[in-house]
Structure formats: structure tokens, C-alpha cells
Curated annotation (Swiss-Prot):
L-citrulline binds at Y87, N123, R127, S176, E261. PANTHER family: ARGININOSUCCINATE SYNTHASE. It comes from Burkholderia pseudomallei (strain K96243). One of its GO terms (molecular function) is ATP binding. Belongs to the argininosuccinate synthase family. Type 1 subfamily. SUPFAM superfamilies: Adenine nucleotide alpha hydrolases-like, Argininosuccinate synthetase, C-terminal domain. Pathway: Amino-acid biosynthesis; L-arginine biosynthesis; L-arginine from L-ornithine and carbamoyl phosphate: step 2/3. This is Argininosuccinate synthase.
């Protein structure tokens, strides 16, 4: 059935501007462009003009920054979530935030079809459509990349030139970027050859470590139940806190990653990520957990962290499995409150001191000096008990103590 009102997730870039024009021509129906403000640096007036030229009946811009950080980034931070123990999930966390806003708008404005500008080769089509299937299974999705004849970014640029759509991409600069409040990515062009080193002239946020200040900068992060709430003693909201850490990390060369990851479809892809705030937050959060989580709780949390990151990466933020893991994670964080000092210096991020009223660390019990010492009698009893199982296993193996 031909749609009457398509709602397109719109970034204003080459892909979605081409998609907008294509949808309007191909379906000849109302097309609303929906842009979620997740903290990307954008000329909103220019975006409005571009969307109008590309054929949008309306451009909607919604500020989702607080929702993005508070409801998506911070819950994942509590899990220390990453993908393949490397990628800090800046894009996979953004996609469900966008889809949630998109569908909430769709429900209020008689939208009968969703659309996106994700390519048929990448991960984002999965993230968009899995989230949409969970939140709005009744709304179909149309993906221009899967039905038009265009095959490359060069083709898209030529299409926009042909139809007078102003885009910032150039045929001689085909790097692709995705930006939000917690990271900016750089992909494509010369980076598609893993033999090529990243050219620091293409960095967007981060000062090259060799050009960063020669003095260490120390900041103090405050956490409450696993959630960051302050910087240097000043209580901050989620957006302002992340912005402050981005500035501090970027000027000190912190948060650069050059990653080769395994896509959802199994193919390997290379991306460069600049995520100063996330890098600082992850380091500080892990340090605080070291004194506030019991050994076995920490081990259990670590067991699910990889699964959590994999679930988010595969576009299943709204799935039952993510919600189950989140309940466990949230319970693990009830004592993760305190302050962490972090040193930033020429690309390094080093937690150097930590304090918490919920600390399980007892200096008195572990000191090398006089204190509440564990007696020799206590230690002997502990070792005898600890060795019972090992002794039984050794006897079974025939280890009589006579040598090999």
C-alpha cells in the first residue's frame, strides 16, 4: 500500500538529503524530515533550507540531549558497556534514542511509514529497524538505499548536484562522520585501507597528544549509584557534565580510538572515534567500582558487561534481554557512590585517587604496618580449609608427595 505520510530520520547530510528528495519523488506523498538534536554541532538554519530544497513538507528538530545521556548513555556506563572490549558505543546508543523520539512523533501526527538513510551494508539499518519493530511493529519502514539505483557516495553527490541540493560533502573528500554529544566518528575514504595511518589533520575534537599541554590536568568526578553527577565538586546535569568532560579530555588529547570492529553481518570495518568524555567516565567508574563492589558482585557484573555491549551494538536496546541485564546492573550499582580523581595528560587518562563512604577497602586490615592483623593461627586455619578440596583432587590424581 502506498504511504500517505513518511517520517524520515534526517541528519541533513549527504545520505539523508538524497533520501529525502528520492522519497518525495518516488512516493509522491507527504514527507516529514525528523532530526534529533543529540548534541551534534549543526547550523540548524542551514539544515532547514537544505531540507526544504530537498522536498521536505516539514522539518522537525527535537532536542533529545538530556534523554540521550540520561536514559541511554548513563545506563550503559553503569554496565561498563563496550563492544569487543574496545568500542564505547557512541553510535549504537544514539540510534535507539532517535528511533524512540521518531516514533513518539509519528504517533501524534498520523504517520503511516518510517524511513532512514542507512546503507544496506552497515549496522545502522539493523539498529533502526530492530528498535522500530519493537516499539512500532505496525509501522512499515522504507529504506531508499535498498531500492534506488545509486551505489556509492559519489553517486549520491552527483544526484544532489543534479537536483540542486546543497551538501557539504565533496567528491574529493569522502570521509563520513557521525556526531553526537559523546563522540564523533570518521570513516571511509583512505581509512578503508588499514595500511593507512589516520591523518591527524582530519581530527575533529581532539588535540593531537603531541600538541597537548605539558602539564597534567586533574579533575574530580562525583558518582551517585553509578551515575556521574558532578565535576570538581560542582553538581551538573547530564548534558553539561558530558560537555565539560569533552572539553577537558579533548584539549589533553584524551579519547582517540582507531578501531577495527566486526560488524553485525560479520564483516570487518575500520572507524576512528573521538570520545573524550566517555573515555574519562569509563575509567573513573571502573576505579570507583574497585572499592565499592564486592569481589563476586564485580565478577558477576563483568560476566554480563560483554553481553550487554553486544546486545546494544546489535540494535536490541529495547529487547527483553537488555532490560533483564539492566535490572542486574542497576542492583550492582547501589553502593557505587563517591569521588574519583583523574589525571589527563597527552592522551592518557589515569584515575589516581578514589574516595567513597560505601568503600569496602579496609586499610587497617591490609596494611603492611601494625593494624588489625590476621594472626598466624587464623591464616593456618584458613589455608587448611582452603586446601581440603585441592588435597582430595591431588589424592585422586595419585600425587602422594613422593615426586613425579
Amino acid at each position: 500500500m502506498k504511504p500517505k505520510h513518511i517520517l524520515l530520520a534526517y541528519s541533513g547530510g549527504l545520505d539523508t538529503s538524497t533520501a529525502l528528495h528520492f522519497l518525495k519523488r518516488h512516493f509522491d506523498c507527504r514527507v516529514t524530515a525528523y532530526c534529533a538534536n543529540l548534541g551534534q554541532k549543526e547550523d540548524w538554519e542551514r539544515m532547514k533550507r537544505r531540507a526544504a530544497i530537498a522536498g521536505a513538507d516539514e522539518l522537525v528538530i527535537e532536542d533529545l540531549r538530556e534523554t540521550f545521556i540520561g536514559d541511554f548513555v548513563f545506563p550503559a556506563l553503569k554496565a561498563n558497556a563496550s563492544y569487543e572490549r574496545d568500542y564505547l558505543l557512541g553510535t549504537p546508543l544514539a540510534r535507539p534514542a532517535i528511533v524512540k523520539g521518531l516514533i513518539e512523533y509519528a504517533r501524534k501526527h498520523d504517520v503511516d511509514c518510517l524511513s532512514h538513510g542507512c546503507t544496506q551494508k552497515g549496522n545502522d539499518q539493523v539498529r533502526f529497524e530492530m528498535a522500530a519493530k519493537i516499539l512500532a511493529p505496525d509501522l512499515p519502514t522504507v529504506a531508499p538505499w535498498r531500492i534506488w539505483s545509486l551505489q556509492s557516495r559519489e553517486d549520491l553527490f552527483a544526484y544532489c548536484q543534479q537536483h540542486g541540493i546543497p551538501v557539504e560533502s565533496r567528491p574529493d573528500n569522502l570521509l563520513s562522520h557521525d556526531e553526537n554529544l559523546v563522540h564523533i566518528t570518521t570513516e571511509g575514504d583512505y581509512l578503508e585501507s588499514v595500511a593507512n595511518a589516520f591523518d591527524w589533520r582530519d581530527a575533529n575534537w581532539i588535540t593531537p597528544p603531541t600538541q597537548a599541554p605539558d602539564a597534567i590536568e586533574t579533575i574530580t568526578l562525583g558518582f551517585r549509584r553509578g551515575v556521574p553527577v558532578s565535576v570538581d565538586g560542582a553538581a551538573l546535569g547530564p548534558v553539561e557534565l558530558v560537555e565539560r568532560l569533552n572539553e577537558a579530555g579533548a584539549r589533553n588529547g584524551v579519547g582517540f580510538q582507531d578501531i577495527i570492529e566486526n560488524r553485525i553481518n560479520g564483516l570487518k570495518v575500520r572507524g576512528v572515534f573521538e570520545n573524550p568524555a566517555l573515555t574519562i567516565l569509563h575509567a573513573a567508574h571502573r576505579k570507583l567500582e574497585k572499592i565499592t563492589l564486592g569481589r563476586d558482585v564485580e565478577r558477576l557484573r563483568n560476566l554480563v558487561s560483554d553481553d550487554y555491549g553486544d546486545i546494544v551494538y546489535r540494535g536490541l536496546w529495547f529487547s527483553d534481554e537488555r532490560l533483564c541485564l539492566q535490572a542486574l546492573i542497576d542492583e550492582s550499582q547501589k553502593y557505587v557512590s563517591g569521588d574519583v580523581k583523574v589525571q589527563l595528560y597527552k592522551g592518557s587518562c589515569t584515575p589516581c585517587a578514589v574516595e567513597s563512604e560505601q568503600s569496602l577497602y579496609s586499610r587497617e586490615l591490609v596494611t603492611l604496618h601494625a593494624g588489625r592483623a590476621i594472626s598466624g593461627e587464623d591464616a593456618t586455619g584458613f589455608l587448611n580449609t582452603l586446601g581440603l578440596r585441592i588435597g582430595i583432587e591431588a589424592a585422586r590424581a595419585g600425587n602422594t608427595g613422593a615426586g613425579a
